[in-house]
Amino acid sequence: MSKVCIVTGKRPATGNNVSHAQNKTKRRFLPNLHAHRFWVESENRYIKLRVSSKGMRIIDKKGIDTVLSDLRAQGHKI
């Protein structure tokens, strides 16, 4: 399963671990993803989405119906 937020599109980024001696080794910064069930009142069912914490805040702000219509317009099958 890919580590991508379906709402925001956040995906893993790359960077460096830097020690006190300034030695650098490559690492990945992973998004804070959660598999979360959202109740959709208009469809009278739960929808399970893999979203980041920022994605959850967007859903709280805009509403699940608006976010779902935007995702379906982008071509996501939900």
From Swiss-Prot:
Keywords for this protein: Ribonucleoprotein, Ribosomal protein
Source species, domain of life: Bacteria
GO molecular function term, any single one: structural constituent of ribosome
Descriptive protein name: Large ribosomal subunit protein bL28
Keyword field contains Protein biosynthesis: no
Family: Belongs to the bacterial ribosomal protein bL28 family.
GO BP annotations listed: translation
Matches recorded under Pfam families: Ribosomal_L28 (PF00830)
Keyword Nucleotide-binding appears in the UniProt entry: no
One cellular component term from this protein's GO annotations in UniProt: cytosolic large ribosomal subunit
